[in-house]
Amino acid sequence: MAEPFPAEGLPLAEALARVLADLTPLEGAVRLPLADCLGRVSAEPCQATASVPGFRAAILDGYAIAGEPVPQPGDRWRVVGRSAPGAPFSGALAPGQAIRILTGAPLPELGGRVLPQELVTREDDTLTLLRETSANPWIRAADEEAAAGQELVGAGRRLGPADLARLASCGVASLRVRPQPRLGLLISGDELVPPGQPRDPGTIWESNGTLLEALLTRLGQRVAQRRVVADDPEALGEALEALAQTCEVVVSTGGVSAGDADWIRPLLAQRGDVAFWKLFLKPGRPFAYGRIGGRPFFGLPGNPVAAAITALQLLWPALQRLEGSTPEPLPRLQVRLAAPFKRGSGRPELARARLRVTATGELLAEVDGSQASSRIGSLGGADLLLEIPAELGSLERGQLLWAQLLRLPIF
């Protein structure tokens, strides 16, 4: 079969560019309650309908006084009322008057300053300033969170906890979001046995489906269907086409290398289209991208670490594009190797490593002892993917490298 790409495989950056160029965002939008919008992508801008909080409020507990010059120690006021959250003082303050005010409570008319309670003493209704106060009035502006008409979120934003909280604080109860692609996941292999079932010699418990579905769920995506199929070309072909009929994206793991039982790539060529095959990358060389039934198809390697890493590098950005957001790569930072690392040169490598911060703030990478792409446990302790160029072989302690941080934004 003719291959329109280098025999050693495509560089990762070129492969990603080809994938993204082949995709356009899914059409449409759906309105969801705010509680269901976490991780979804906004379909349109949302503006504040009113200023928030909508009134001037005390930043701390104390006493509100009229907007007179900065008071001096020994100044006195008569306490005429109280303002609490949900129970504001209804009158206006005159010079020489004060009201007790709690954090978050509205300031009364003509109230221009809050005196922190630590700076005053009160006897009956007489308030006395004990020490100098700052020029800070300790007042939250009426439009501190948002002004009426201000954009709260723009179109194409992936919504986090802070976005949802801000929208809620501005009275927004629901939002129009972009549709999410339904993912169809196909796991292939004669050797696979469901977890919990007895297995014969030479078989393994199937874990790639669990790994990928959990990873995609952590990334805010949803696997609509998950199938495990033996290495039978007819059954695999039917499963691929069935997934393409009900899902917007089809993902497989295993069967994309060049072995006698690797049927996925030839089936894709027969029943769909192969855009490219093989990556110039370790781990993750056996990788296929194309179309099946008109749907984007991602053929991930069968080794679990390679499947997870290629999913992060290529599938995750593609899903972001389909949702209508700008694909955001994992954060990158520079680190130094904490110890020598031996490897064979020839392919660029994404090596799992732990991040250690020294007492002086230096960032060190501790490479996991085994970089075998079949070793699932090496993913659990990894904080970083070290970006090792193809031309570098054995690396010395202190070698400076770029690394991808395996952490998602919190807010």
What is each stretch, according to the model?
Residues 16, 20, 61, 117-118, ...:
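Predominant activation on well-ordered alpha-helical scaffold segments within soluble catalytic domains
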Residues 56-58, 69-72, 90-94, 107-109, ...:
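Solvent-exposed alpha-helices and their adjacent loops that cap or buttress functional pockets
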Residues 7-74, 350:
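Intrinsically disordered, low-complexity, positively charged segments
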Residues 20-27, 45, 107, 153-157, ...:
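Structural signal for hydrophobic packing residues in well-ordered secondary-structure cores
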Residues 1-13, 175-300, 304-310:
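Helix-rich terminal scaffold detector
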Residues 16, 30-35, 39, 44, ...:
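Flexible glycine/proline-rich
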Residues 2-13, 31, 63-230, 369-370, ...:
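Short, glycine/charged-enriched hinge/interface segments at domain edges or termini
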